[in-house]
Design a protein with these regions (language model features):
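Short acidic-glycine-tyrosine-enriched beta hairpin
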Residues: 181-239
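Intrinsically disordered, low-structural-confidence terminal and linker regions
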Residues: 1-29
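A short, N-terminal "cap"/entry segment at the start of jelly-roll beta-barrel domains
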Residues: 56-139
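Conserved short histidine dyad/triad with adjacent acidic residue
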Residues: 102-104, 137-160, 183-184, 239
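A short hydrophobic beta-strand segment most commonly corresponding to one strand
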Residues: 251-268
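Short beta-strand His + acidic residue motifs that chelate non-heme Fe in jelly-roll/DSBH
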Residues: 177-178, 237, 243-249
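Extended, charged low-complexity segments
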Residues: 6, 12, 272-301
Length: 301
């Protein structure tokens, strides 16, 4: 059972673009307009129960609309639990998000290898302002993804910070999160600050090519904690705070729902890497069908 029992029409309207933006651009030609869907689902009412919405998604022959509804209900549950500090039933939300991905052709799902070596699938992106910024993704770690990336580069540039407050809920597996501090006034620096520059012409929701560019600021790193998180647990990262994540669940998968929000303040995003490197291009494999990974995760739940 989810905490969210109903969705009102204004919330639905506000969520339309952030949900649609999480799909590949071709999805725009498949999904009906906001006005059409609003009329179809609400039919003059101000609210609709999540049970009614899910029942509609189960019964309609329009798979693109079904995918949208499953994703909407799942994402709204994540946001509600985050903002109200409620326990997130990750299995319930997983079922909705998994359906949302499975029911449409894989080419309509944006999926790419993130800088930390996981498969990243956007689910919701609201980016009208920094203060109201909200970005939710599904992250999947699995050793089958190793062939799509340069593992040394992933390791070299895996310590990073975020502009926004981040929270990660573990769906399955065993996720590690190490935290770091640094000092720049040191004679024993081993690392440097890097700026990540994205190829602006590429997909704005999941970039798949970027450069880590040396900023001429050297630093000494200190690991301050090592954490391990399991299914039904979560961890949080404050803006500007350094961390490094990964998974410890081989040969099985690990998966998380990961969110950024601007409501907790704005920080600075940067990457720490070996100081002997001046510039490094990071290519991320795009359009990896996630279905086999969804199947694998289902067997773990």
């Amino acid at each position: 059972m989810t905490h969210i029992q109903k969705i009102d029409i204004s919330d639905f309207c506000d969520s339309y673009n952030p949900i649609v933006k999480s799909y590949a651009t071709e999805y725009l030609s498949k999904i009906d307009s906001l006005e059409s869907i609003k009329t179809l689902l609400f039919n003059g009412l101000n609210t609709k129960s999540t049970i009614e919405l899910i029942d509609f998604a189960d019964e309609t022959t329009d798979n693109y609309l079904s995918s949208f509804i499953y994703r909407l209900v799942g994402v709204k549950e994540i946001i509600f639990c985050r903002e109200n500090k409620k326990h997130l039933n990750t299995n319930e939300v997983w079922r909705l998000i998994s359906k949302s991905i499975r029911i449409i052709p894989s080419e309509l799902t944006i999926s790419s290898i993130g800088s930390q070596g996981f498969l990243s699938i956007p689910l919701y992106k609201k980016d009208l302002s920094l203060e109201t910024f909200d970005f939710i993704r599904l992250h999947i770690w699995d050793d089958s993804l190793d062939k799509f990336m340069d593992l040394k580069k992933c390791q070299d540039f895996s310590i990073h910070s975020h502009t926004f407050f981040a929270k990660s809920w573990i769906i399955t597996g065993k996720v590690k999160n190490d935290r770091y501090e640094y000092e720049t006034e040191s004679d024993f620096t081993t690392h440097s600050f890097f700026e990540v520059q994205y190829n602006k012409s590429l997909n704005e929701v999941n970039q798949h090519s970027s450069k880590a560019v040396y900023k001429n600021i050297n630093a000494r790193l200190f690991k301050t904690s090592e954490e391990v998180h399991f299914a039904k647990g979560y961890y949080e990262i404050e803006p500007s705070k350094l961390h490094q994540s990964g998974h410890l669940n081989l040969p099985n998968s690990s998966a998380t729902f990961f969110s950024f929000t601007g409501k907790e303040g704005i920080g600075e995003s940067f990457v720490i890497g070996p100081k002997e490197i001046v510039e490094s291009e990071i290519n991320r494999k795009m359009n990896i069908s996630p279905i086999y990974l969804l199947d694998k995760i289902d067997t773990q739940l």
